[in-house]
Amino acid sequence: MNRSRQVTCVAWVRCGVAKETPDKVELSKEEVKRLIAEAKEKLQEEGGGSDEEETGSPSEDGMQSARTQARPREPLEDGDPEDDRTLDDDELAEYDLDKYDEEGDPDAETLGESLLGLTVYGSNDQDPYVTLKDTEQYEREDFLIKPSDNLIVCGRAEQDQCNLEVHVYNQEEDSFYVHHDILLSAYPLSVEWLNFDPSPDDSTGNYIAVGNMTPVIEVWDLDIVDSLEPVFTLGSKLSKKKKKKGKKSSSAEGHTDAVLDLSWNKLIRNVLASASADNTVILWDMSLGKPAASLAVHTDKVQTLQFHPFEAQTLISGSYDKSVALYDCRSPDESHRMWRFSGQIERVTWNHFSPCHFLASTDDGFVYNLDARSDKPIFTLNAHNDEISGLDLSSQIKGCLVTASADKYVKIWDILGDRPSLVHSRDMKMGVLFCSSCCPDLPFIYAFGGQKEGLRVWDISTVSSVNEAFGRRERLVLGSARNSSISGPFGSRSSDTPMES
């Protein structure tokens, strides 16, 4: 599979969160030496190649061509054909060319007068006749992040490297561009935005957690440009000796295999949940940088998970073992329940409009709508012909569900009530679709990543059938996460409504 334009995971950042002028990293010589030494040490541990690189040399043909071009022209000898270019005296007289050198410059007298009206400006900004901005000015404006800008962070797998791309999206100005990127050490599989700052002053930040093909979770600061290492990491790589033993169980240090999905607890901000190919879910205490709990309910790779939007203790996860698990994280071993399905679980998501309900998608193309208090699904939807890798409810429009699949299609559904209906279907021309996400501030704006064509943003409200189905539907905006709660599958401490119309 060609990896030249693959986007494997995507996440949005709300308007007004990012720093207006991001900081730029300036490394000292000592820091550069330290980073180089650490990189060499990692390469040696992983059995990297030699440090020697082949250097190219100019070819003989190229050198010969350069010599030919640099050789001076030889003077013409008598009798050469080019001597015919010399004009005789009669021709000079006919055109008065023999007196050409005697004539004065007609513009010489008026040159000084013409300069009298010339105005010189210190810069193009001061010149009223220069209306086009220079490139540097455009770059300065693009570097600033406005309060109305959303950020979109996606993991990209290039042919020879992997990185995070940070895009700026502004619907009002119709702008969408790459702001900066971050070089990654491993293939990215999941991204999750969070604002928890591990510093003691309990401030908020603008961070992105990245799960990859290694057991280590990297957390990067999105307000810093040109950073070469994450702010902090969770977990550690296994040594070669431990790998040879073939142990699959999770240790106190963290996962032992790739991290497939991440979910941040918005109510208890120092908690991050991770799903891994080692069959476990780990709850991380980011203030300590260590696992707080390890959940080993599944018997195969855990591919997806999500915290409840209003209940800090409630978590769901989906696995290759064709099951979904619901946990009460206060006592996960004792308080959990399971649902079994026909296929491997690809995605799970809570319905933030109906907090007792959640959705699950499978690798055989089905979507299930479930009540956490019941064993039977509310409805089963045969949505696609292949695995469903994107499962996203609109951030503000009740009943609007968007699914993305390996069958290359994105489909928009109205799931209000017990009978879902297809509103629109589109081949995105992106090959296999890997991920999707709805903008938290704009309910009809979705981002998609796939096998090719990079990151794509689609305003689904431009489709007439979408406008007919959802255009007049009431928008419900989520209230503050700190003040909002609602009765859910494990009860709640508050009766405040989580929605504001």
UniProtKB/Swiss-Prot annotation:
Where is this protein found? Answer: Nucleus; Nucleus, Nucleolus; Chromosome
Q: Which UniProt keywords apply?
A: Chromosome, Nucleus, Phosphoprotein, Repeat, Ribosome biogenesis, Transcription, Transcription regulation, WD repeat
Output the Gene Ontology terms for molecular function: histone chaperone activity; histone H4K20me3 reader activity
Indicate where the modification Phosphoserine is found in the sequence.
50, 57, 59, 485, 494
- Disulfide bonds, which pairs? none
WD repeat segments run: 116-171, 177-222, 247-286, 290-329, 334-372, 376-415, 421-460
Gene Ontology CC entries for this record:
chromosome; Golgi apparatus; nucleolus; nucleus
Whether Lipoprotein counts among this entry's keywords is no
Quote the tissue specificity entry: High levels seen in the placenta, skeletal muscle, kidney and pancreas while lower levels were seen in the heart, brain and lung.
Q: Where is the signal peptide?
A: none
InterPro entries in the cross-refs: G-protein_beta_WD-40_rep (IPR020472), PWP1 (IPR044285), WD40/YVTN_repeat-like_dom_sf (IPR015943), WD40_repeat_CS (IPR019775), WD40_repeat_dom_sf (IPR036322), WD40_rpt (IPR001680)
* Residues recorded with modification Phosphothreonine: 21, 55, 86
Bias class Acidic residues marks the residues at 77-89
Main site of residence? nucleus
Describe its assembly: Associates with the RNA polymerase (Pol I) complex. Interacts with POLR1E.
Q: What does this protein do?
A: Chromatin-associated factor that regulates transcription. Regulates Pol I-mediated rRNA biogenesis and, probably, Pol III-mediated transcription. Regulates the epigenetic status of rDNA.
The family this protein is said to belong to: Belongs to the WD repeat PWP1 family.
- State the protein's name: Periodic tryptophan protein 1 homolog
What organism is listed for this UniProt entry? Homo sapiens (Human)
